[in-house]
């Protein structure tokens, strides 16, 4: 299993293929609906995503003894970000998009053009993902958007994912759908 460490280098990302399991370690930032809309509307994102990771996640986070503790951090459905993701990939230089359920052809094309991949995280395992968060380093837009929509900065350790859309234009979701249709046709 390949280990991806922040900063995520383009040459490493371009070496990944759809279907390959990976673990992600280092800085991973969250962003979901409010984040993407804010970006699309020209809002200033206060962090640099170049060679970084964006996790579609609305975590449950509590403050204990003056520090943030991540209780749950499951992926949220990525398809909602389809209208925004190609531009975000192009403009930010992000290398990893992490979520669940896949994204559209425009995002796949942006991944291929700009050296990015879409990683499928395990849905329904928010406690498992939270256990991979060593530290919540910081948070942006907490007061404005609330904890679930805020942009969190997590220090992750061995976060398991699968390359679902690679930088060569291959989508695991499309491959599985095609194989399923072929199998169905053979049954008829």
Region roles according to the model:
Residues 1-8:
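Short, structured beta-strand/loop micro-motifs enriched in basic residues and often containing a Trp
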């Amino acid at each position: 299993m390949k280990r991806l460490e922040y900063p995520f280098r383009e040459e490493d990302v371009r070496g990944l293929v759809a279907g390959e399991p990976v673990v992600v370690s280092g800085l991973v930032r969250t962003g979901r609906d409010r984040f993407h809309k804010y970006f699309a509307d020209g809002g200033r994102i206060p962090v640099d995503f170049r060679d970084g990771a964006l996790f579609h996640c609305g975590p449950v986070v509590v403050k204990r003894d003056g520090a943030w503790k991540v209780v749950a951090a499951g992926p949220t459905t990525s398809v909602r970000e389809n209208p925004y993701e190609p531009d975000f990939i192009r403009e930010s230089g992000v290398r990893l998009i992490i979520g669940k359920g896949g994204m559209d052809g425009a995002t796949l094309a942006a991944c291929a053009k700009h050296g990015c991949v879409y990683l499928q995280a395990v849905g329904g395992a928010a406690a498992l993902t939270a256990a991979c968060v060593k530290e919540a380093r910081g948070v942006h837009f907490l007061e404005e958007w609330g904890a679930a929509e805020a942009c969190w900065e997590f220090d992750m350790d061995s976060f398991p994912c699968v390359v679902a859309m690679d930088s060569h234009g291959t989508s695991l979701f499309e491959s599985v759908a095609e194989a399923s249709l072929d199998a169905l046709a053979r049954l008829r």
